[in-house]
Amino acid sequence: MTYREVLEYLDARPPRGERRGLERMRLLMHKLGDPQRSLRFVHIAGTSGKGSTAAMTERMLRACGYRTGLFVSPHTFDFRERIQLDGVMADKALLAETLTEMRPALDALDAMGDPAAAFETMTALALCVFARKKPDLVVLEVGIGGLLDSTNIIDPPEVAAVCAISVEHTNLLGKTIPEIAAQKCGII
């Protein structure tokens, strides 16, 4: 695959899975050899401020001499903003090579009729990239919620942080602050 094909492939993935939960992500990561198990994480959830908190945390860790990975969403200009190593966007060739290696596992889920959604695929791609490059710590920003978010496929993190919480995504997380907070705190 080329980098352009990576972007096209990700764009063609379904926006959401047929079922909500981590079952599909667990199966995908198992088929990929559970690369996330070789990594240490700082996991960050919240309604607002989580991206800024993730970026600041990554910079502080790097300033302290740690080799870092960073996974955030969405991106502003370049998809590679989502997956960074030591403060630098992931190399296009690295992303293409990694997704090429992931394709048999992704194709297997497709053949089962339960394809990995776009964000699940991006999360898996980031985790596989990080497993290859072996940073000391990965700062991982939750997509939506926490408890059932694809980033919650990791083992308990070194640190879990929950930023400000407000009413959002009520169709997925609940209608009240306590319901939404329970979802976000699912990363702890």
Language-model regions: role of each:
Residues I153-A164:
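Inter-motif core of Ras-like GTPase G domains
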Residues M1, D11, D155-P156, P178:
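ATP-dependent carboxylate-amine ligase
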Residues M1-G46, T53-A55, R59-C64, L70-F71, ...:
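Short functional linear segments
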Residues A164-N171:
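Conserved Switch II/interswitch segment of TRAFAC-class P-loop GTPases
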Residues A181-I188:
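Membrane-proximal helix-turn-helix segments that form the acceptor-binding/catalytic region
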Residues R16, I144, S166:
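Flexible, active-site-proximal loop/turn residues at the rims of small-molecule/cofactor binding pockets
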